[in-house]
Swiss-Prot record:
It comes from Oryza sativa subsp. japonica. It comes from the Eukaryota. Component of complex II composed of eight subunits in plants: four classical SDH subunits SDH1, SDH2, SDH3 and SDH4 (a flavoprotein (FP), an iron-sulfur protein (IP), and a cytochrome b composed of a large and a small subunit.), as well as four subunits unknown in mitochondria from bacteria and heterotrophic eukaryotes. Its main location: mitochondrion. This is Succinate dehydrogenase subunit 7, mitochondrial. The gene is SDH7. GO terms for biological process: tricarboxylic acid cycle. It is found in: Mitochondrion inner membrane. Residues 1-41 form a transit peptide. Keywords: Membrane, Mitochondrion, Mitochondrion inner membrane, Transit peptide, Tricarboxylic acid cycle.
Length: 90
């Protein structure tokens, strides 16, 4: 039984590997290894700047406010669940 031409062409196309497009630059791993020493500009950028000292990070206070907010949310949810159960039982 003879196969139609389009089936044989389809099979050969499926068997042959597709050419892959080059990877995008932002998806490639960095070329710079971790063992390479930092340059002078990078070292200068990483140094502590005294002019920026007054704009200190408020990271710890933000964490504390977040924890308090999470606790209050839990208390409100517990109170709502308690009210629902109390109304269902009465």
């Amino acid at each position: 039984m003879a196969q139609p031409a389009f089936l044989s062409a389809l099979r050969s196309r499926l068997r042959s590997p597709q050419p892959q497009a080059p990877a995008l630059p932002h998806l490639q791993p960095p070329r710079r290894g971790f063992h390479v020493e930092l340059g002078a500009r990078e070292k200068a950028l990483l140094e502590e700047d005294t002019a920026l000292k007054r704009f200190k990070s408020y990271k710890n206070s933000v964490k504390q406010v977040s924890k308090v907010g999470n606790i209050l949310t839990g208390v409100v949810l517990f109170a709502c669940a308690y009210e629902i159960v109390a109304l269902a039982n009465s």
